[in-house]
Amino acid sequence: MKLVLASGNQGKLNELKALLSKQPVEIYSMSDFNNIKEAQETGKTFAENAIIKAQNVADSTGYLSLADDSGLEVDALDGAPGVYSARYAGENACDQDNNNKLLRSLKDIPYKQRTARFKCVIAIAYPDTPPVTFTGTCEGYILREPKGDRGFGYDPLFYHPDMGKTFGELYQEEKSSISHRGKALEKLVANFQDVMSLMEG
C-alpha cells in the first residue's frame, strides 16, 4: 500500500520511513506529486488542521495520507499560541519574534503559573473513509529567558522538569524520546496495522 506524507519536509519523510520500515507500505512525499494544492489550515485545533492537510492529500492522490500539526499551549494564556504557534507574532514572524512576544505576554506571570505543553496531532486519511488521529503531548514550563541553541521555535524557552533542561539544550535523540511528536508517532506505529485494516476495509 502507498502512504503519502502531507509535507515536503525531507527530515519528516526520513523519520517516517525509519519508523514504518517493517510495515508493508511504500512511503512518498507530497513533493512526488504534481497535482496537490496547498491545504488551507483553517482549523481551530491541531486535530482539525492535521485532518484538513491529510484529507487534502488523500483526495488529491487517491492514496492513504498522513499529516501532523503541532504547537505550544500556555495555560496562563488560555492555550495560546496554539494553532497560531508558527505565526504568533504575525504572518512573517521568525522564531525570535514569536519567542519575544511569548516572553512579553508572560512578563508578570510567576514561574509556577508558566505551565505549558507542546502538542502534536497526527492524522491519517483515505478517500471516503473517516480520518484517524493520534495525539502526543509533552508538559513543561516557559522560562524567562532562552537557554540552548539546539532545536527550533519555542525550544529554548520550553523547560522540561524531568530532563532538567530546555528543549533547546537537548540533543535530537534526547528530545525525540520525550517529545510530543515522538509520542504521537509511537501511538501511530503501535496501531498502524489496525489503521491499515480500517482504511482498506
Swiss-Prot record:
Sites where the protein binds Mg(2+): 69
Binding, substrate: 7-12, 70, 152-155, 175, 180-181
InterPro entries: dITP/XTP_pyrophosphatase, ITPase-like_fam, RdgB/HAM1
Active-site residues per Swiss-Prot or TrEMBL entry: 69
Names of the cofactor(s): Mg(2+)
GO terms under cellular component: cytosol
Taxonomy, superkingdom: Bacteria
CDD domains: HAM1
Reactions accelerated catalytically: XTP + H2O = XMP + diphosphate + H(+); dITP + H2O = dIMP + diphosphate + H(+); ITP + H2O = IMP + diphosphate + H(+)
Co-factor: note: Binds 1 Mg(2+) ion per subunit.
UniProt key word Membrane: no
EC number: 3.6.1.66
Keyword list, A-Z: Hydrolase, Magnesium, Metal-binding, Nucleotide metabolism, Nucleotide-binding
Gene Ontology molecular function, alphabetical: dITP diphosphatase activity; ITP diphosphatase activity; metal ion binding; nucleotide binding; ribonucleoside triphosphate phosphatase activity; XTP diphosphatase activity
GO terms, biological process: nucleotide metabolic process; purine nucleoside triphosphate catabolic process
Task of the protein: Pyrophosphatase that catalyzes the hydrolysis of nucleoside triphosphates to their monophosphate derivatives, with a high preference for the non-canonical purine nucleotides XTP (xanthosine triphosphate), dITP (deoxyinosine triphosphate) and ITP. Seems to function as a house-cleaning enzyme that removes non-canonical purine nucleotides from the nucleotide pool, thus preventing their incorporation into DNA/RNA and avoiding chromosomal lesions.
Similarity comment: family membership: Belongs to the HAM1 NTPase family.
HAMAP family: Non_canon_purine_NTPase (MF_01405)
Record text on subunit structure and interactions: Homodimer.
Name listed for the protein in its UniProt record: dITP/XTP pyrophosphatase
Species: Natranaerobius thermophilus (strain ATCC BAA-1301 / DSM 18059 / JW/NM-WN-LF)
